[in-house]
Amino acid sequence: MLLCNRKVPKTLNTCFILHIFTLLTLGVLVSGMPSKMVSFASQETLQRINNLLRGSANRDVDIIAEYLKKDDDDDGGDKDHHNIDIDPLPRRPSLTPDRQLLKVGLHGAISSDLEVCSNLTINEVLLKFPGSNAADAAVTQALCKGMVNFFNSGIGGGGYVVFSGKDDEDHLSIDFREKAPMDSHKFMFENCSLCSKIGGLAVGVPGELMGLYRLFKERGSGQVDWRDLIEPVAKLGSVGWQIGEALGATLELYEDVFLTLKEDWSFVLNSTHDGVLKEGDWIKRPALSNMLMELAKNGSVAPFYDPDHWIAKSMIDTVAKYNGIMNLQDVSSYDVHVTKPLSMKIRKGANFIPDNDMTVLTSSGSSSGAALLAALRIMDNFQNQEGGDYEKETTYHLLESMKWMASARSRLGDFEGEALPKHIEEVLDPEWALKAVKSIKRNSQDGNFKTLENWTLYDPAYDINNPHGTAHFSIVDSHGNAVSLTTTINLLFGSLVHDPKTGVIFNNEMDDFAQFNKSNSFELAPSIYNFPEPGKRPLSSTAPTIVLSELGIPDLVVGASGGSRITTSVLQTIVRTYWYNMPILETIAYPRIHHQLLPDRIELESFPMIGKAVLSTLKEMGYTMKEVFPKSVVNAIRNVRGEWHAVSDYWRKRGISSVY
């Protein structure tokens, strides 16, 4: 019987119990370390799980109970939320960022979370093969990130990429988001909502490899072989590398989990198998390395998706072991969604770039690119203000645009083909933005700025989904090409399912679907556009973006990780760049602001840095505020007078850019 796909049986198997144990023992990350443990489930759900566990000899209920604490978050929302989508690093913005974290390149640049991967990509691809381009480099960069920071991305997941070339017809958007298995249906998590987060049922069909291969075939330089892009990463996994701060801290957080699941996760354990490897230790991933070498020799990704190949068979066996429903047909039938990027003009004749049309390219498909464009269209009705960051009027405009953007996101969902569905066309219609602009102007008469008194006035259509996790990188090359790519396995270590034969860590992307008959605490129904269906991709908050100058040259390449904070972080980065005329270093380092409409409050990364005067002004406008642990990570590259200024979000994830 497939667990959670129907009524939960009275006797749970061992692996499911261990996964429930895993979910309940992870903690909220405070000041970079798990200083207090908080359950991720409601008290009702916990009681149901405890009742099930009482009949098991595998785990004493009392051991689990000591980890359970009352959820004291005051957001008024669903208590089944969690904070297991971000690494446990100390994260803090900066008003005085170190200038050495701004990297300046004459030929090209890579902005990502991992300097080791950016250096490897530049040396082994862009410099080793002079004719290679950003699309080629993106393959190596993505695979390297999944190899090293395997807690938040990898070939067991999926994502989105936007490519821009010299000509308009070169621009491309690829949706390689995971797909729901063909046996999926909207009732599948009705009896066990936690099963969308952990175990085999949480796994969507991985798409990262197919997406990277399609990018390579469609927009690669043709001057480098597929094998040349894969081998450097395979060799890294074979030889190994020194564990950095982010991976070390995340492994430490999950130590009890991996000791419990040591049979499948032995590669993260020390030589005596009584603990995980630590920061500074040497780690190898031989299984993944061997599998990548097989793909390199094959010259394609065919073995990964071939139902008769040992790679695909091993993956399916592993997912089935943990009660998953993904089968060989799901894997063999997976395809990506290739379209032109969504695009629009901004800042025509704006104060600081006279007579200049900036073209914004962003992702289509199941991403939130359409919502980002809707917010930019709203913001484009308001004037620039140099130095306007956290000024009264500009901040009001930005916050209200964020709230309307959340309303737009509630209408989004996966679709196929080039034509946009009516519910997505609606939010891209200038009339929709005009409605928001009129509301903003009506409530800011004579300098008296007021947010709308009730969130319902922003007209969200459905519950606003809250995705998690993610990793992003931006690349520009010496030929004028750019890549903005965001990829994820969703929560930390995805579904916690690892195939020790192939080295694949599987996503838990099924958690990003809406759950049928489960309205949120604000009585908003789940989105009809985002229910689990066979072959469907769940809605993502991802919005990898490239901004082109009037000459068609990449001017800003940007994207973010951080779940629902992705779109607001990308929006604020673009607004700071083109509305406030801020340098890219300060744009990324400074504290960020976030509003997703529900819960109806502003989230601020640092009250002290923003200051009492600004906080008082926001309160007068009618906003409720909460200081939060920084959760979004932005990696971007800016064209400054022909030079590439690359900045990674060191302040939130220790990223350092690389240039050449």
Swiss-Prot record:
UniProt record, GO biological process: glutathione catabolic process; proteolysis; xenobiotic metabolic process
Cross-referenced InterPro entries: GGT_CS, GGT_lsub_C, GGT_peptidase, GGT_ssub, Ntn_hydrolases_N
Glycan attachment positions: 119, 191, 270, 298, 454, 517
Record keyword Acyltransferase present: yes
Alphabetized Gene3D superfamilies for the sequence: 1.10.246.130, 3.60.20.40
Gene Ontology CC terms, in alphabetical order: fungal-type vacuole; plasma membrane; vacuolar membrane
Catalysis: reaction(s): an N-terminal (5-L-glutamyl)-[peptide] + an alpha-amino acid = 5-L-glutamyl amino acid + an N-terminal L-alpha-aminoacyl-[peptide]; glutathione + H2O = L-cysteinylglycine + L-glutamate; an S-substituted glutathione + H2O = an S-substituted L-cysteinylglycine + L-glutamate
Entry keyword Membrane: yes
Membrane topology according to the record: Single-pass type II membrane protein
Organism superkingdom: Eukaryota
GO molecular function, one term: leukotriene C4 gamma-glutamyl transferase activity
Lumenal side: 35-660
E.C. numbers: 3.4.19.13, 2.3.2.2
Subcellular location: Vacuole membrane
Activity regulation statement: Activity is decreased by glutathione and ammonium ion.
Mod. after translation: Cleaved by autocatalysis into a large and a small subunit.
Keywords associated with the record: Acyltransferase, Glycoprotein, Hydrolase, Membrane, Protease, Signal-anchor, Transferase, Transmembrane, Transmembrane helix, Vacuole
Catalytic center residues: 470
Primary localization class, coarse: membrane
Function as written in the Swiss-Prot or TrEMBL entry: Catalyzes the transfer of the gamma-glutamyl moiety of glutathione (GSH) and other gamma-glutamyl compounds to amino acids and peptides. Major GSH-degrading enzyme, catalyzing the hydrolytic release of L-glutamate from GSH. Plays a role in the turnover of the vacuolar GSH, serving as an alternative nitrogen source during nitrogen starvation.
Family under the similarity heading: Belongs to the gamma-glutamyltransferase family.
Subunit structure: Heterodimer composed of a light and a heavy chain. The active site is located in the light chain.
Protein name per its UniProtKB record: Glutathione hydrolase proenzyme
Gene (name only): ECM38
